[in-house]
Amino acid sequence: MEIKDIERSIIKKYRKEIWSPFIKALKEFELINDGDKVAVAISGGKDSLLLAKVIEELHRHSKVDFDVEYICMDPGYTEENRDRLEQNLSYLHIPGKIFETEIFQIAEEVTKGEYPCYMCARMRRGALYSKAQELGCNKIALGHHMNDVIETIMLNVLYAGKYNTMMPKLKAKNFENMELIRPFYYIREEDIIKWRDYSKLSALDCACKVTKSEEAYTRKMIKQMIADMKKDNPGVEISILRSAHNVNCDMVVGYQQNGEKHTFLEEFNG
């Protein structure tokens, strides 16, 4: 497929499913502003590859004056996966800057191979922040989509006993003046898959052998649970997402703010 057709499809064929919700998130959450330099983090998966193309289109046509870099971290890919990453960058005409780390190996050694996903994610995030800062960027864009957000909400409620969501943007704790943004906050995974298939793209899944062996079991359970609920309630995904926008602190027993715990008794006893 011609690259011009792939690029055009983002704004034309998939305007309703991809471009419009992307623009909605940018405006609603003020994700990209004049003077920003955004590092698009590309793992080689479908989400980050589409994110790179969408932000590329924005950079070409938007009135917002910002700069962009495309960074690709190799956390220890096999030769086959590294080759596929490079092929996808070439196929999509993405000028990605690849840099190497040993994160897969370190995460597996530290956790002794038992569910290293959290450790791996934190290390990858730190490496991306460092590279972005080195390139003079003030923001990192990640490809987390709407389904990632709602699955995170449900994981926290059902497995951690707390209400935490995946925020559309965050300030970095350990990297001064750096922010993380999630422009795909309103985009469904099924629509990203449609674009991937239309574009005839062979994207990477998580290339970690430990994750493959454990199959990210808990998150897959949550994904299946939501799919089952959707059969009876087609709007369940939107309802879960909206719950993070409609928390009524007058109707919760306890909550935290700035690391400090509060209870309803503070107001009740006035």
Write out the residue ranges for each language-model feature:
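Short, low-complexity, intrinsically disordered N-terminal peptides in bacterial proteins
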Residues: 1-5, 267-270
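ATP-dependent adenylation/nucleotidyltransferase module used to activate substrates
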Residues: 2-155, 159-162, 167, 190-198
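Electropositive phosphate-/nucleotide-binding environments in soluble metabolic enzymes
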Residues: 12, 16, 49, 79, ...
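Catalytic subdomain that performs nucleotidyl-dependent activation
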Residues: 67, 148-221, 225-228
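Short, solvent-exposed coil/turn elements at secondary-structure transition points
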Residues: 74-76, 102-104, 172, 186, ...
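A general structural signal for short secondary-structure boundary/capping elements
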Residues: 116-121, 142-144, 185-189, 230-232, ...
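Short, basic, helix/turn surface patches
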Residues: 121-133, 169-175, 226-243
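The feature marks non-catalytic terminal segments
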Residues: 201-270
